[in-house]
């Protein structure tokens, strides 16, 4: 028996035993060096996600000339989700569906991202969006993931730092109602700091908000700690 026939037989064995499709059987065998027993065990113990529903949602909005959802499709999609383009929940959608940049979705991350959490229809995605909105009302772990995602999502091709104006707009969008000193921070950034915003500065502001919530007087703030210089300058600004 030639090697290719041997592999085909092993694939059929796995398919027969697990009821899986050929691609699933082949992928499992290749992953585990063609060990049939291990491949079967892996398939039987790994939940299989149906991608067809989320793929149909993607097809409804994708550009007819390319396998992606462009700006026009994105606007219609967000509207059909029951969202406004100017609300922070849109960022949770972008993160979930692996949007590479503002106004664009590509098939694989969109389909896999939604399918993984049960978003296989538009109504299911609408329901999940309501859950996203509820989870974004405070500084919690879910919100932190979205906050950190936002920085890279907003960077345009060739950019390494976020323009100050963009950062200010999205801080206002994300942090209103969550950070009581937001107006002071934005005043500091626009009137004294006057520079573009690095990823480190963006991320560490979140950590500083948590720190300040526990120590409003900032008595325990250590300028020699791991804080970036922008936070050091902000603390000086607050104490003036």
UniProtKB/Swiss-Prot annotation:
Protein name: Defective in cullin neddylation protein 1
One example GO MF annotation: cullin family protein binding
Record PANTHER family: DCN1-LIKE PROTEIN 3, RP42 RELATED
GO biological process: protein neddylation
Function: May contribute to neddylation of cullin components of SCF-type E3 ubiquitin ligase complexes. Neddylation of cullins play an essential role in the regulation of SCF-type complexes activity.
Keywords tagged on the record: Ubl conjugation pathway
TM stretches of this protein: none
GO cellular component, as recorded: ubiquitin ligase complex
Signal peptide: none
Annotated ranges, domain UBA-like: 7-44
Gene: DCN1
InterPro entries: DCN-prot, DCN1-like_PONY, PONY_dom, UBA-like_sf
SUPFAM superfamilies for this protein: UBA-like
DCUN1 domain: residues covered: 49-239
């Amino acid at each position: 028996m030639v090697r290719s026939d041997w592999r085909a037989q092993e694939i059929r064995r796995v398919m027969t035993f697990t009821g899986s499709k050929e691609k699933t059987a082949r992928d499992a065998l290749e992953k585990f060096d063609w060990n049939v027993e291990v491949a079967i065990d892996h398939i039987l113990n790994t939940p299989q996600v149906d991608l067809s529903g989320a793929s149909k949602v993607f097809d409804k909005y994708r550009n007819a000339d390319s396998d992606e959802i462009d700006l026009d499709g994105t606007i219609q999609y967000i509207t059909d989700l029951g969202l406004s383009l100017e609300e922070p929940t849109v960022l949770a959608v972008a993160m979930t569906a692996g949007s590479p940049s503002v106004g664009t979705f590509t098939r694989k991350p969109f389909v896999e991202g939604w399918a993984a959490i049960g978003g296989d229809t538009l109504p299911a995605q609408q329901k999940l969006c309501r859950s996203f909105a509820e989870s974004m009302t405070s500084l919690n772990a879910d919100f932190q993931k979205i906050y950190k995602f936002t920085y890279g999502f907003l960077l345009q091709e060739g950019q390494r730092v976020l323009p100050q104006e963009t950062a200010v707009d999205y801080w206002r969008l994300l942090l209103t109602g969550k950070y009581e000193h937001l107006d002071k921070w934005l005043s500091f950034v626009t009137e004294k700091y006057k520079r573009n915003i690095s990823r480190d500065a963006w991320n560490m502001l979140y950590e500083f908000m948590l720190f300040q919530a526990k120590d409003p007087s900032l008595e325990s703030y250590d300028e020699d700690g791991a804080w970036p210089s922008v936070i050091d300058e902000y603390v000086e600004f607050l104490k003036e």
